[in-house]
């Protein structure tokens, strides 16, 4: 299946450009599921979001029969929908962890049966909080993840050292010898982690 959110606001059709600054973009929203082979619509559900101070970022992710919609205005909002029917299963919101260096626009991470939306991890099935106390990080330092591990740059970002947070045993390990960037240069897959150097062009100190 292919999932997406679309706006059916008729006023958008008269916009002179595809760069839409109008708050109408967030009106008449629908969550849609298509058959990936035929393009046939499987279901389409009207959804509502908090569009006060219209969203800064807007993400849709899928795992374990859940569609996770995450967005921010002056707070983080997390809505989980059934991928089978499109019905809402649970909804959460919480304040930003900080108001600088991208603290208002982190993307969600789905790790195992949890979705991490800073600074909490919610269980996919029911929205119960399963992770608190996410690593304190400096700079922009957003996180990426593999099946059971979260990768990030710690508070000592002037050294640029990467850390691994194993969610199975809650251990956090320092890995020295490479400097990743604050904004998603750690990519994992097939038992490996790819970390191209990111020491150039970053305004953070690099000894």
For the regions a protein language model found, what residue spans apply to each?
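A short beta-strand motif characteristic of beta-propeller blades
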Residues: 40-49, 87-98, 128-134, 171-176
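Repeat-blade elements of multi-bladed beta-propeller folds
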Residues: 1-30, 45, 49-79, 92, ...
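Short loop/turn segments that connect beta-strands within beta-propeller blades
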Residues: 35-38, 82-85, 124-127, 166-169
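Generic alpha-helix detector with strongest preference for long hydrophobic helices that associate
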Residues: 62, 67, 167-168, 174
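Aromatic/acidic polysaccharide-binding cleft in carbohydrate-active enzymes
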Residues: 198-207
């Amino acid at each position: 299946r292919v999932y997406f959110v679309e706006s059916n606001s008729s006023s958008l059709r008269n916009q002179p450009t595809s760069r839409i600054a109008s708050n109408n973009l967030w009106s008449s929203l629908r969550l849609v599921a298509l058959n990936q082979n035929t393009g046939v619509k499987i279901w389409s559900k009207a959804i509502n979001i908090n569009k006060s101070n219209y969203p800064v970022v807007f993400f849709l992710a899928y795992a374990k029969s859940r569609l996770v919609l995450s967005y921010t205005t002056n707070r983080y909002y997390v809505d989980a929908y059934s991928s089978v029917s499109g019905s809402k299963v649970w909804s959460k919101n919480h304040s930003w962890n900080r108001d600088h260096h991208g603290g208002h626009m982190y993307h969600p991470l789905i790790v195992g049966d949890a979705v991490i939306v800073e600074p909490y991890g919610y269980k996919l099935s029911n929205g119960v909080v399963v992770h608190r106390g996410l690593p304190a990080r400096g700079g922009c330092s957003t996180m990426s993840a593999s099946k059971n591990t979260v990768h990030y740059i710690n508070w000592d970002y002037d050294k640029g050292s990467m850390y691994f947070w194993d969610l199975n045993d809650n251990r956090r390990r320092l890995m020295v010898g490479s400097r990743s960037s604050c904004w998603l240069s750690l990519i994992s897959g097939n038992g490996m982690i790819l970390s191209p150097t990111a020491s150039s062009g970053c305004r953070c100190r690099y000894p």
